[in-house]
């Protein structure tokens, strides 16, 4: 007889990708905002010098292993919400639309100052959006922005709104200071460096996109279709807060690339094997190389921003895409690719 005080769950064995397609959804504008303060990896190593000497470790992991030479930070008076609003304003201006037509705004940032209210509601206020504009956060680790585009497209395709604004603002000052302080503590070990290493690879920045109907916005870029896939058995491999980020680096790399390959094999990989650009979530040289190899794609078509910006979380994909816009031409086919903590994988096809 089962104990009624204990919940029992049955595992579902059905496997597969979640797939979607849109007929008339497009990116009207997409922008990136650089955090202005540059922090080099050499500067981080200099701060960690007492730790390296004490545990007998060599500096240079950020550059030699992760391939990150520098990252950015916001000034102390610029918070996550301000960073999101900065990108949102820029995206609205570049889109050329009247902001009163925006019917949905979502903030997809990992970084947040509070549990409630949402970050989106403050960005809504800062940008002077209408009272009919739905506003809430979407939180899904580094895939949040891609989920935001999908949600926006769903609203538009259903005829419920005309335009949506997806924003994201990330900052690293607090978590990296906490990580360095923790490593400089006399009790820290080399194992602490490896379990906290991911927090040192993070970068600050913001991004935003206005989403609308392709038919109503000449020169916009279609959101064609996409795939999502979950492997939630790996939800403990990367767990983060503003205080710290604990990561099983090898297991995360192995499980993430495995999930990416399984999702790729079930998606339309033949059609996606020869895209003009692949916009990856930006983590490190090791992660990018592993995904390029396992998907069998041309590395020359994979632009990288992590060497000089670090991993900007959910902002990384739109940030990198926005940086790539000057080199894209009408007719180019673009695939956004991401694996986020949880684990979840995503592929979203764009027609430029």
Each model region followed by its residue ranges:
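Condensing-enzyme catalytic core mediating Claisen C-C bond formation in acyl metabolism
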Residues: 2-77, 185-254, 339, 351-352
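Short, well-ordered amphipathic alpha-helical segments that serve as non-catalytic structural scaffolds
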Residues: 54-58, 81-95, 255-270, 320-324
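Oxyanion-binding "anion nests"
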Residues: 237-278
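Glycine/charged-rich beta-loop-alpha catalytic/anionic-binding loops adjacent to active sites
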Residues: 69, 101-106, 127-138, 187-194, ...
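Claisen-condensing/thiolase-fold acyl-transfer catalytic domains that form or cleave C-C bonds
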Residues: 7-11, 15, 85, 111-113, ...
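Short beta-strand segments
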Residues: 28-31, 139, 164-170, 211, ...
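Acyl-CoA/ACP chain-elongation machinery
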Residues: 160-179, 232-235
